[in-house]
Amino acid sequence: MEYEFRRRIDDVVYRFAPDGLVNGFPAWKRVDLDIRLIRHADKGWCTVDSAGTINGRPWNVEPEEQSAAPFEGEWVSKKNDKSYVYDLVKLTDGSAAF
């Protein structure tokens, strides 16, 4: 199973492929960059860079409300002075954006 982050402002799509386990939960890695989608012990589902810095999270979904799978829906990211809104979509056959 793969996921896509679909950026709302310009329709840029980032695909994440399975990448083993982190903290006892499945993890995914962005196919073009060292960014991972993981379940953080305190923060819940998030994206992290290679240093482990959180740079994306579900919008308005607290960790205790999250399930064992990444939250599908609205996410926000922050990199330096820029923030973006994305939709996280679980891919099924034929549902990829590209």
For each of these PLM feature ranges, what is it?
Residues 1-98:
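Interface elements of modular peptide-recognition networks comprising either
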